[in-house]
């Protein structure tokens, strides 16, 4: 009897000790566990909103194209209607941005970078609806923009929204959930979870506070976002180019040449983006009426362009597989490349809510395919496949422009499911990055953020100067 009692007491003591250990562990790790839970919520919400954004944009595009099909036999109706529909959709996006949330204009990625440094505000209650509806208008109009910028900014703002809902006040939680939402947003846009993680670590490395809690939160958010995306869209790669052949070792030097070409193109492209932004700023001078009319004209132009040459309009996801398959001649590839450079500059630099990743991927594909086809003529003994150069070119322009080679490499490989091309991708992207840096090119998003902060400081200084003397004391 005594033995049974002693055994029972010993078991109770062990249970109490275990409970005490668990309680102390929970108390010690309460904040990290709460952050990880909220990261899962942020990732899930970002995945849901990202999928909804994609589906809504596709629906608007299909409705617009369906209306044009109805009058396809009447040219006197078709051309004006193509202009008017795209112009009206674009004007909705420009008006909402200018009137209610100027920070929702453009890509939105520089805004997230600024918010991570506590230099830009995060007003999720106005950015979320404006970015969603405005992006739906501009992308639905057929403008040369991508959905990755909106989903990254939407994801970051959802992170801040969750933080406010759960009433977390710590700077660590604020920073971590913002970064988690941004990573989940990129993953939701491209079905590329690893690229989403690398994007935060590489592109936002000056702003991202790397520690065990933050990186675990980013992982958690990206996992949830990717699961949601695949539930609705399946597990197939987002860009279907088929399985391409490996790049023989004796052709790798050609990829270095391609990287050098993109190393020259990247800084020039960035410079053109900034110059075009300045041109538009001088034109509208901040007046909402001029800004909206300008946006409508650009949107209408894209609508007309979509009738003349569909490959020259839109984000570019539909163009990439066609171009990579070698269905265009070298001359036509270069013509579409130049045309899309112009339309990308007009659409993105005007401040329309939309990203530039997808247009850059399309530009890289066009130039890479043209290079591959030329290489096949000049070096027939190598039997080069144009599609492999298209894949390498997709990541190279991003590497040279955004200065994120790792993200560019992994993003393209995840999107196309051609992991066997990792070596030529590394060679091309490294060559492009090194030459762009040597030529003095600056990362695009960092430069845009610096200009935004300079404008913010100038506006604040002007406000302080115009304020009554009593308000400044």
From Swiss-Prot:
Family matches, as Pfam families: Voltage_CLC (PF00654)
Short motif Selectivity filter part_2, span: 146-150
Molecular function GO labels: antiporter activity; voltage-gated chloride channel activity
Periplasmic side: 70-76, 233-252, 310-329, 377-386
One GO cellular component, as annotated: plasma membrane
Matches recorded under SUPFAM superfamilies: Clc chloride channel
Site residues by UniProt (Mediates proton transfer from the protein to the inner aqueous phase): 203
Keyword hit for Glycoprotein: no
Catalytic activity: 2 chloride(in) + H(+)(out) = 2 chloride(out) + H(+)(in)
Name of this chain's protein: H(+)/Cl(-) exchange transporter ClcA
Native organism: Salmonella paratyphi A (strain AKU_12601)
Lineage of the species this protein comes from: Bacteria, Pseudomonadati, Pseudomonadota, Gammaproteobacteria, Enterobacterales
Gene name of this polypeptide: clcA
């Amino acid at each position: 009897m005594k033995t049974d009692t002693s055994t029972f007491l010993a078991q109770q003591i062990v249970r109490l000790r275990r409970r005490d250990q668990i309680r102390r562990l929970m108390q010690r790790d309460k904040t990290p566990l709460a952050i990880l839970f909220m990261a899962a919520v942020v990732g899930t919400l970002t995945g849901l909103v990202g999928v909804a954004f994609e589906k809504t944009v596709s629906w608007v595009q299909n409705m617009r194209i369906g209306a044009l099909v109805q009058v396809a036999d009447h040219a006197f109706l078709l051309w004006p209607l193509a202009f008017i529909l795209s112009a009206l959709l674009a004007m909705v996006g420009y008006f909402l941005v200018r009137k209610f949330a100027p920070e929702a204009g453009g890509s939105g990625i520089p805004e997230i970078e600024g918010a991570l440094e506590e230099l830009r505000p995060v007003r999720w209650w106005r950015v979320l609806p404006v970015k969603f509806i405005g992006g739906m208008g501009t992308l639905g109009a057929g403008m040369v923009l991508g959905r990755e910028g909106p989903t990254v900014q939407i994801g970051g703002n959802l992170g801040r929204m969750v933080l406010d809902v759960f009433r977390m006040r710590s700077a660590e939680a604020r920073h971590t959930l913002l970064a988690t939402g941004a990573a989940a947003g990129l993953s939701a846009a491209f079905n590329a979870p690893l690229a989403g993680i690398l994007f935060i670590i590489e592109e936002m490395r000056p702003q991202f506070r790397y520690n065990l809690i933050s990186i675990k939160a980013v992982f958690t958010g990206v996992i949830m976002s990717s699961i949601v995306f695949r539930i609705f869209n399946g597990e197939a790669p987002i860009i279907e180019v088929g399985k391409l052949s490996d790049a023989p070792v004796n052709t790798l030097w050609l990829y270095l040449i391609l990287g050098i070409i993109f190393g020259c193109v990247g800084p020039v492209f960035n410079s053109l983006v900034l110059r075009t932004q300045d041109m538009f700023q001088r034109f509208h001078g901040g007046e909402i009426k001029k800004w909206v009319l300008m946006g409508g004209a650009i949107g209408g132009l894209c609508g007309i362009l979509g009738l003349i040459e569909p490959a020259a309009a839109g984000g570019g996801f539909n163009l990439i597989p066609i171009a990579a398959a070698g269905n265009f001649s070298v001359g036509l590839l270069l013509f579409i490349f130049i045309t899309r450079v112009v339309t990308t500059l007009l659409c993105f630099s005007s401040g329309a809510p939309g990203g530039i990743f997808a247009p850059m991927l399309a530009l890289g594909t066009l130039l890479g395919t043209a290079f591959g086809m030329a290489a096949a003529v000049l070096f027939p003994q190598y039997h080069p496949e144009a599609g492999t150069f298209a894949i390498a070119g997709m990541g190279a322009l991003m590497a040279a422009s955004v200065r994120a080679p790792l993200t560019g490499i992994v993003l393209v490989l995840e999107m196309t499911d051609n992991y066997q091309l990792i070596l030529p991708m590394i060679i091309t992207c490294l060559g492009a990055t090194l030459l762009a840096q040597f030529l003095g090119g600056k990362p695009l998003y960092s430069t845009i953020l610096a200009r935004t902060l300079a404008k913010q400081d100038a506006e604040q200084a002007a406000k302080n100067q115009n304020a009554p003397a009593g308000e400044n004391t």
